[in-house]
């Protein structure tokens, strides 16, 4: 049952120079760049809604840090930087988290992808919360985290970092096949299901 207000919105905007970057504009051989951290919004939500229960797993400072992640939900600045750099696809990692967003970029672009799981940035607070609540932070809503497809991803990551935005290359787009590379293992990257947020419990 719906127990909280739900708001739906239709948004209309104008493009600059008639150029639009879609989720499906990636090309094989490009790098996958990620901004900020896995589970950005989900961490803030869980730390607020389950604050009392989480006190036995996190220090007061860690809880405050986790709740403060709500300040990082805008992707406007990195979008402008990536657009100017020449990125061909971008996707905000909302429901389904980082892995869901990467899968959607590959799916919409008709491509495969290799995801370097160990290179995905994540806050220690997020790890602790997800461990306590029995969920995977890679599938946790990550609004504020942008997934970008571009050539020479390391250079773009450096450009983002120069502007104070955490960024890392976490994958490579391929002609076919979608995989996660974990501890020298090559595991299938499956289509995202429900967000880990809905499975969280103490």
What are these regions (language model features)?
Residues 1-51, 172:
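Glycine-rich anion-binding loops of enzyme active sites
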Residues 1-4, 23-27, 45, 58, ...:
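Solvent-exposed alpha-helices and their adjacent loops that cap or buttress functional pockets
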Residues 8-22, 60-82:
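Active-site glycine-rich loop that binds ribose-phosphate moieties when present
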Residues 10, 157-161:
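Alpha/propeptide regions of enzymes that mature by internal proteolysis
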Residues 67-142:
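Active-site-proximal betaalpha loop/short-helix elements
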Residues 143-149:
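A short beta-alpha structural unit
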Residues 149-155:
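Helix N-cap motif at beta-to-alpha junctions
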Residues 161-202:
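Acidic, Ser/Thr/Pro-rich beta/coil linker or hinge segments at domain junctions
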């Amino acid at each position: 049952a719906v127990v909280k207000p739900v708001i739906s919105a239709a948004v209309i905007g104008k493009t600059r120079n008639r150029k639009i970057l879609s989720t499906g504009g990636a090309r094989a051989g490009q790098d996958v760049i990620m901004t900020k951290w896995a589970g950005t919004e989900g961490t803030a939500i869980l730390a607020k809604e389950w604050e009392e229960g989480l006190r036995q797993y996190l220090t007061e400072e860690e809880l405050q840090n986790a709740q403060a992640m709500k300040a990082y939900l805008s992707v406007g600045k990195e979008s402008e930087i990536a657009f100017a750099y020449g990125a061909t696809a971008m996707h905000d990692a909302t429901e389904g988290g980082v892995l869901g967003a990467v899968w959607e970029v590959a799916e919409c672009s008709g491509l495969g992808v290799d995801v370097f799981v160990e290179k995905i940035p994540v806050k220690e607070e997020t790890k602790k919360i997800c461990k306590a609540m029995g969920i995977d932070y890679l599938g946790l809503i990550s609004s504020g985290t942008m997934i970008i497809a571009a050539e020479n991803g390391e250079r773009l990551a450096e450009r983002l970092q120069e502007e104070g935005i955490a960024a890392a290359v976490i994958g490579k787009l391929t002609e076919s096949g979608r995989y996660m590379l974990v501890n020298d293992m090559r595991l299938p990257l499956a289509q995202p299901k429900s967000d880990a947020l809905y499975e969280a419990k103490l």
